[in-house]
Amino acid sequence: MRLLFLLFLLLVCLAQKTSGRKRNTKFRQCEKMGGICKYQKTHGCSILPAECKSRYKHCCRL
């Protein structure tokens, strides 16, 4: 019973780890496009079509 619980716990941890990697690749698209995540109040940059972690930031190429 204890072994079954440990296997289940390992499965849950692996599932969390893989979902976290998918989330990080989604937010690294800005860096791959040559941009950086900046606050929306910054001026003088062109906005790129990529997502940032914070909803108050956008992907910006200076």
Swiss-Prot record:
This is Beta-defensin 33. Residues 1-20 form the signal peptide. It comes from Rattus norvegicus (Rat). Has antibacterial activity. The lineage of its organism: Eukaryota, Metazoa, Chordata, Craniata, Vertebrata. GO terms for biological process: cell chemotaxis; defense response to bacterium. Keywords: Antibiotic, Antimicrobial, Defensin, Disulfide bond, Secreted, Signal. The keyword Signal applies. Belongs to the beta-defensin family. It is found in: Secreted.
